[in-house]
Amino acid sequence: MKNDYRTFKLSLLTLAPIHIGNGEKYTSREFIYENKKFYFPDMGKFYNKMVEKRLAEKFEAFLIQTRPNARNNRLISFLNDNRIAERSFGGYSISETGLESDRNPNSAGAINEVNKFIRDAFGNPYIPGSSLKGAIRTILMNTTPKWNNENAVNDFGRFPKENKNLIPWGPKKGKEYDDLFNAIRVSDSKPFDNKRLILVQKWDYSAKTNKAKPLPLYRESISPLTKIEFEITTTTDEAGRLIEELGKRAQAFYKDYKAFFLSEFPDDKIQANLQYPIYLGAGSGAWTKTLFKQADGILQRRYSRMKTKMVKKGVLKLTKAPLKIVKIPSGNHSLIKNHESFYEMGKANFMIKEIDK
């Protein structure tokens, strides 16, 4: 008989760009585009250098200045105007892919804002365990009959919403402590190199028009074919059983998700799976983060109160990145089936196995 405490190794393989944000953005006054690279200097070190060069006041005025011409509000403009060739300000660089902007390959320098990837205390990018845990929760919610039913919707109040009390979560007064997801503990990933990051643009593909529309939203994202590992520890029999079944549950979730949503879009925009499927991070679409069958109708009403409406089931969330080929037993396999460099934003695969600790 197995002990309550069990440990699993989850190996994640990104099939598309994945963005885990920290809620912050770089403005055009905080990064430099030149020589086919985006350079994000350490702004503290940058300011100290300006103090040394007696340009601190001038730089402060530049930061609060508003000019009609956006080009003149860029950090590169300040450097050029003050004849500063130095670039030793710490920070990091991200190489250009040529697909950052919808306009043309030479317009990457016109990007005004970049959503930051989350970083640890040492400034290194990583994936928090809470992000993976949220994706696991979505899979388990959609594949467990006692949660995936009519009780999943709370009709109390003006607008229906998810019933947060369906799954035991946290202490409840007068009740025995029961918190399933506290019994599923997901580690943070190890930090990875900035070389694994690319900049990507948001694209929305409409099933109604069969066209992809670019949006002026840019994200630091993990590039496709990046391998990242996590440890999952379970502390109860129920939690251990659910994680043991995570692979087949992920396949069941994807089968239903594809029938519900992905089937409405061209097959060449949908990526094939190599392992167990999962969607992670920002920009993968609302249906990948909820009980989609129960949320159908609720999400549309919620979006009706926003500036951007959801028509029917909404749009497919895509982005562009360079073509990647992976070797599989049957030969070379392209991660995408289209010639436009479109990937499903946030898509990944994983393998999982129990390990001894």
From Swiss-Prot:
Origin: domain of life: Bacteria
UniProt key word RNA-binding: yes
Gene Ontology MF terms in the entry: RNA binding
Pfam families recorded: RAMPs
Keyword RNA-binding listed: yes
Listed GO biological process terms: defense response to virus
Keywords recorded for this protein, A-Z: Antiviral defense, RNA-binding
PANTHER family reported in the protein's UniProt record: CRISPR SYSTEM CMS PROTEIN CSM5 (PTHR38007:SF1)
Subunit structure of this chain's protein: Part of the Csm effector complex that includes at least Cas10(1), Csm2(3), Csm3(5), Csm4(1), Csm5(1) and mature crRNA. The Csm complex is elongated and slightly twisted with a maximal length of 215 Angstroms and a diameter of 75-80 Angstroms. It has been modeled to have a central protein filamant of Csm3 subunits along which the dsRNA helix of paired crRNA and target RNA binds. The filament is capped at one end by Cas10 and Csm4 and at the other end by Csm5; ssDNA is thought to bind to the N-terminal HD domain of Cas10.
Family of the protein in this entry: Belongs to the CRISPR-associated Csm5 family.
Function noted in UniProt: CRISPR (clustered regularly interspaced short palindromic repeat) is an adaptive immune system that provides protection against mobile genetic elements (viruses, transposable elements and conjugative plasmids). CRISPR clusters contain spacers, sequences complementary to antecedent mobile elements, and target invading nucleic acids. CRISPR clusters are transcribed and processed into CRISPR RNA (crRNA).
Miscellaneous comment: Encoded in a type III-A CRISPR locus.
Protein name as catalogued: CRISPR system Cms protein Csm5
Organism: Streptococcus thermophilus
Gene expressing this chain: csm5
